[in-house]
């Protein structure tokens, strides 16, 4: 029986440990699928059409009210993981969010929550946040579409994954204004993180599969830490040539955040964020959010 694993962005470092878990054979009989945006990915999990999703942890709440029916299994990496990139013609400076006033910024459903909240906290208004031109359909590669739209000046900036940011910078089009994982405030870093998620039904009926998935991510973390170049061979199978040549370096940068455990404080900060957004109606306990094998 095939195990269906879906992620909302493929040509990206964001969910790469899930990609590696499948492609390196740590989760036997697993098939990887791309299903964008993450809100749609979690709806498919809720409807029983997927076994596991790698996605933004807080976005589970778009499909599972107050965490009822789903659980986080493990972290694919720690901290919020998107980049804010602005076109160079605006002369943006790293860390200076005031440059965004009046600009058109592209962001995806789910990830956009983190951008809106950090701008609210910084007191930055008058930013036009909307979808990325071209990022439509379930197979969209959001970061690459964002970098393309920026180069074509269909956008003034974007909030997207590390691959989109790297491409925009290397092409001389964009400047990274904020790397949330490394430069955000402690609150911002704690808004969300990439997680592996499954339904309560899977945990109830096939707990051994859920446990195997956690072990597969841990094994992928270990393999990528030992040799980030393993990512290149995977990229060559799944990515366009340029992005395949970049992925190992992006993974090398991310390996310090490759810890699969989910701490209590991580859940607490994520749930505060979700409550601020109105996605979570009440405080919930750690065990209502995270499944831990016996």
Please place each PLM-identified region on the residue numbering:
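Bilobed "Venus flytrap"/periplasmic-binding protein-like clamshell domains
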Residues: 2-25, 30-35, 82, 91-167, ...
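Pocket-lining segment of extracytoplasmic ligand-binding domains
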Residues: 139, 145-236
């Amino acid at each position: 029986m095939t195990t269906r694993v879906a992620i909302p962005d493929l040509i990206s470092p964001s969910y790469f440990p899930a990609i590696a878990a499948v492609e390196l054979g740590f989760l036997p009989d697993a098939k990887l699928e791309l299903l964008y945006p993450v809100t749609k990915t979690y709806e498919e999990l809720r409807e029983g059409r997927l076994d596991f999703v790698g996605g933004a942890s807080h976005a589970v709440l778009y499909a599972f009210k107050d965490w009822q029916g789903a659980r986080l299994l493990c972290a694919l990496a720690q901290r919020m993981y998107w980049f804010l990139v602005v076109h160079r013609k605006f002369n943006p400076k790293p860390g200076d969010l005031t440059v965004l006033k009046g600009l058109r910024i592209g962001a995806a459903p789910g990830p956009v929550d983190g951008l809106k909240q950090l701008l609210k906290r910084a007191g930055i208004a008058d930013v036009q946040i909307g979808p990325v031109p071209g990022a439509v359909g379930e197979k969209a590669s959001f970061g690459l579409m964002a970098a393309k739209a920026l180069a074509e000046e269909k956008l003034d900036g974007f909030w997207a994954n590390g691959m989109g940011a790297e491409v925009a910078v290397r092409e001389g089009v964009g400047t990274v204004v904020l790397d949330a994982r490394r430069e955000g405030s402690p609150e911002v870093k704690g808004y969300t993180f990439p997680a592996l998620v499954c339904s309560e039904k899977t945990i109830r009926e096939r707990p051994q599969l859920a446990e195997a998935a956690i072990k597969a991510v841990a094994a992928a973390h270990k393999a990528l830490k030992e040799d980030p170049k393993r990512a290149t061979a995977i990229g060559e199978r799944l990515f366009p040539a340029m992005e395949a040549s970049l992925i190992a370096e992006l993974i090398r940068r991310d390996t310090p955040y490759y810890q699969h455990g989910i701490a209590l404080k991580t859940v607490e900060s994520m749930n505060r964020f979700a409550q601020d957004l109105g996605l979570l109606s009440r405080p919930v306990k750690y065990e209502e959010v995270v499944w831990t094998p016996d």
